[in-house]
Every structure is written in C-alpha cells, then in structure tokens.
Amino acid sequence: MAYERYEPVIGLEVHVQLQTNAKIFSPDAAAFGAAPNTQVDPISLGHPGTLPVLNETVVKHALRLGVATHCSIADRSAFARKHYFYPDLPKGYQISQYDTPICYDGYLEVFPGEEEDASPSAPDSRRVGLTRIHMEEDAGKSVHASAGGTTRLDNNRCGVPLLEMVTEPDLRSPREASLFLQRLRQLVRYLGISDGNMEEGSLRCDANVSVRPQGREAFGTRTELKNMNSMRHVEQALDYEIARQIAAEERGESITQQTLLWDADAGTTRPMRSKEEAHDYRYLPDPDLVEVRIEDATVDEVRANLPELPRARRRRFVEEVGLPAYDAGVLTEERAVADYFEEALRHLYKRTKGGDTDAQAKAVSNFIMTEVMRVLNERDLSVSELGVGPERLAQLVFLRLQDKVSSNGAQEVFEAMLDAPDKSAGRIADERDLIQVTDRGAIAPVVEDVLNDNPDKVNTYLGGKDGLLGFFIGQVMQRFDGSPNPELVRSLLREKLDARRDTANVDE
C-alpha cells in the first residue's frame, strides 16, 4: 500500500518463547502440546511458600540473542513483578524485567530493497533499533468455549521462558514489519534458542502504530495491535489500522490511544481496552530473586561461540562458494538446509578432486532447491528427517555431473534413495538400468547403422527437414541395451549427417 500524504510509524513488541527443558523459575517441563494442566507445579502456580530459581539456560539464550543483535549487555540485571489481574495469571503478577533489562540499545537490519516485488522507493536496507531485550515468564492460556460462555484455563504455559524484544519506532510499512519478524525468526532458529513458530505461539507480536503527515517529526497518537498469529496477519492488520487512522485524520477526527484486537475472519480490528502505561502495572522489585550479574568474560565467550549468522553465510556462499545470490538466499533461510548443502558439497569435492567448483556448487544447489525441497514440502519433513544424507546426495550429484544418469534418471534415483537408506546412488541407478552409456566408441557404430538403414530419411534430412533428427535419436536409443547419453547421441548424429552433407556437396 502506498502512502502519499502520510507516513506510518511502527514499533514492535515481540515475545520469543525459548527452547529449554524446564521453565524459567521452576523444574516443570516446557514442551508444546501437552495435555492441559499437566506441566504445572506449586512454583509456576504461585503457591505460598514457594521460591523461584532462575534457569541459567534462559540467561545464556538471552545473551546469545543480545550479542547477535549488537546489543549492549547489562553487567547487572534485575527482575520485577508486573501486577495485573487476569484469570490465567495465578500469582496475580508476572515476573519480568522493568528498568534493568539484560540487553539494550541493539539493532537488526532488514532489506526491503532485495524483495523480488520491491517498490522503487523501498530502501535497500533499514536498521531497526532495539530498545531492549528482557527475560520474563509466560502467563497461562484462557480457552474460550464457542458455546455456553465458559472459559477454561490451561496453566501449562505459566512460567514458560520468554524473551521480549522491544523495537524503536523505526519501521515504515507493514511489509517492513513482516520482514523484521522473518529476519528475527530466522535468527532465533540459527541461534538454536527458539523454533520461532508463530502458529504455536513461539513467536508472538504486538505492534504499536501511528501515522503522521509526511515531513512531520512529531509522532501521532499510537494504538496497539494484538492477536496477529502469522506473518500474513501482521501485514493485514497493520494495513487495515494504518488505513483507518489515515481516514480518521482526513475527517479531522482524533485517534484514541487504545489496544485493538485483530479479527482475521472479519478483516477488521475491535477495541480491547484503553492502552496501559507502565504505572498501571505497579512494577515492584521481586524480593525472591537475586540480581543477575554478567561478567565481560561471559559475553566474550558467548560472542566467540556464536554460529555464522544468516547474512554472513549468505555473503560467503556468493563470494567464496560461487553461488548466485538467489540460491544463497534460499539455502541460508534455514540453518539445517545450509549445513546440509555445505556437507554435501564437501563430499562432492572429495569425489571430483578439482574442476569447476562453481558449477559443482550450483549442481548441488539446484538439486536441493528442486528435488530435496519438493520432498520436504510434500512429506512435511525437516532436512534431518529426509532419509538421504549429504554424502549420498553428493553421490547422486556426482553421477549427474559425469552424465552417468540423465536429469530424469537422477530424479528417479533420488526417489528410490528415500526408501532405500542402505543403497548408494550408483547401485540404485545400476539396478534400474539408468546408467547412461557415455563411450563415443560404443555409440558411434550404432549411429552409423541407423543412418545406413534409413537412406530415404537421411536424404530428406539433408534436403532441409531438420526435424528428422529426433527420429534418428529415437532409433539409436531403441537399439541400445542400456541408456546412451542423449546429448552425445545428438552430437554424433549431427557430426555424421554433416559429414554426409559435405560429401554430397563435393560429389555435385
């Protein structure tokens, strides 16, 4: 959506649910999908006399995300109680961080100008400032019945560890907001701290949005959008709210600061409540939790052990491996796929022992982006569940590079490899008679026989009917006990037919 007279101003509050074996302050399991109220204990339910104990893994995950997003790390960080009353908050308060977050003043870049359908006005990159990243516990879940007006509580989520990331109001379009979330999801997956699945609630986003006339510095009155559980819903909700605010401004109406719920079915928002300020939550220091102290050596260790991050890996795939930028972007979208590609390429290099490494990398990339990803999507698998490891994929790509199997033959071999984990690509190709004959000396006599057996068609071809070349290729293929390389057959036929044409011209 284009905005001619107004500029949207968007900031995000994103909750990242962490992958840990236990909750943030108790030893309960924190797995998704368990039966309601089966992952609770007195600590997460806030029973009297219980004391929380901070899960060290949560701190490590927070540091990994903070360092990866260029944040400053607080050497001292404390927890606070955020008070509000809601049925799915058993304690009557949420343990969070208020004025001393563990990470602050960072940034994450998005690249709107690299989108295939980017508008000419889209910036190549936008640095989105991060105000803070802090640790907190999740609340429970209210399940509202569609009939009867009853609400049931599932407290499994109480105490599940979260990182809340608050951005600066640096985003200028719904698309940029969606790109930011995609980049963040990719990052937390690379870091191994969250699966980033919005549909399961592992990545949740609220948006603060306002509009202002183009060129004005002061911000307009903002509203907060909630209940956006997919990237598509984020864009749709922001598009709707921006259009609503612009229409109100055009009518001379004031914008009310409030919280709005996105209704995806209706494609509209509805008011939830007036927007709270910090004082509404009565933040108080938590007396049961000691201060978190982070030493410089700890931060240095985290920085040294970070994996290669997506943007750097993509750049290396282009500059050092020799892939096109598009391929590099697709392969680095998920860390597991990028790892699979690199391992397969390493095994291929062992087999080729040199040659055109750019072409070899492209061959592996092509097969992953077509056949491998097709199977992953069709069977809803992760690459680790594929059944064809990187070494076996390298066997198949090597056969293809040597022209031992055709393109269609390689697809057939790959399908068979999925169900035959103990068989090599070469063995499957041999068992299915898919190995191509590539010996010119073996193919040339058959080509000569076909031409000698069809003199009338040869004369017709020489007279200008080039379409008969396909007939000759088919005849050669039929006479082989096996599968000759069709491109080699085509090349030999043209050589011999051209030779006969030259001879005929000389005789004339």
Curated annotation (Swiss-Prot):
One of its GO terms (biological process) is glutaminyl-tRNAGln biosynthesis via transamidation. The keyword Metal-binding does not apply. Its EC number is 6.3.5.-. Keywords: ATP-binding, Ligase, Nucleotide-binding, Protein biosynthesis. It is an enzyme of class 6 (ligase). Gene3D superfamilies: 1.10.10.410, GatB domain, N-terminal subdomain. It catalyses: L-glutamyl-tRNA(Gln) + L-glutamine + ATP + H2O = L-glutaminyl-tRNA(Gln) + L-glutamate + ADP + phosphate + H(+); L-aspartyl-tRNA(Asn) + L-glutamine + ATP + H2O = L-asparaginyl-tRNA(Asn) + L-glutamate + ADP + phosphate + 2 H(+). NCBIfam families: gatB, PRK05477.1-2, PRK05477.1-4. Belongs to the GatB/GatE family. GatB subfamily. Heterotrimer of A, B and C subunits. This is Aspartyl/glutamyl-tRNA(Asn/Gln) amidotransferase subunit B. The gene is gatB.
